[in-house]
Curated annotation (Swiss-Prot):
Keywords: Bacteriocin transport, Cell inner membrane, Cell membrane, Membrane, Protein transport, Transmembrane, Transmembrane helix, Transport. Belongs to the ExbB/TolQ family. The keyword Transmembrane applies. GO terms for biological process: bacteriocin transport; cobalamin transport; ferrichrome import into cell; intracellular iron ion homeostasis; intracellular monoatomic cation homeostasis; protein import; protein stabilization. Involved in the TonB-dependent energy-dependent transport of various receptor-bound substrates. Protects ExbD from proteolytic degradation and functionally stabilizes TonB. This is Biopolymer transport protein ExbB. The gene is exbB. It is a multi-pass membrane protein. One of its GO terms (cellular component) is cell outer membrane. PANTHER family: BIOPOLYMER TRANSPORT PROTEIN EXBB (PTHR30625:SF16), PROTEIN TOLQ (PTHR30625).
Amino acid sequence: MGNNLMQTDLSVWGMYQHADIVVKCVMIGLILASVVTWAIFFSKSVEFFNQKRRLKREQQLLAEARSLNQANDIAADFGSKSLSLHLLNEAQNELELSEGSDDNEGIKERTSFRLERRVAAVGRQMGRGNGYLATIGAISPFVGLFGTVWGIMNSFIGIAQTQTTNLAVVAPGIAEALLATAIGLVAAIPAVVIYNVFARQIGGFKAMLGDVAAQVLLLQSRDLDLEASAAAHPVRVAQKLRAG
């Protein structure tokens, strides 16, 4: 019996080669799922790092702005893909659409809604790929378990056909079956961990973008209030300007 066990190739590759076609398909599918997981991890990690660093730099520059026009001048150098520039454009577009309106509170409310929608859209865009991670993490163990059950069934069939319980006959089939479960766990565990890490990063990034949106809304609100004050007290404002 010992010689038979030694002659049986119980390496990972050997067990794969001797596995049933169904178990092989399960293993290949799980390996492909693992490859997808790590591809998403590396691509999204680079994306998160670049976007976060860029947004942080833009936020620091916009903190020096004292009006919406000044912020637009600063953001002109950010590039067309700048998220901060998109937020400023939303505020500017609402001002242009509401030109002639005296309802400053309505303008602020509509701008706030626009900015919230933009932040939510960015969050959805940053979350692309997380659905695959969640699916892989949820179903991989069960797919591996299916391969294990199928392999054990084949082992029992082999026992019945050979009419022996010799360990040399039983062990290889069971080992091949358990390999499917192991690969399923190898695919699922990183997917779940990476999904949770990305979920936290997306939440943090949306918070940073929300701070920029609040800064844009603050600048717009200040501009509207100053314009309203200038219209209500033109003489006082003119005196202050001359005094300055």
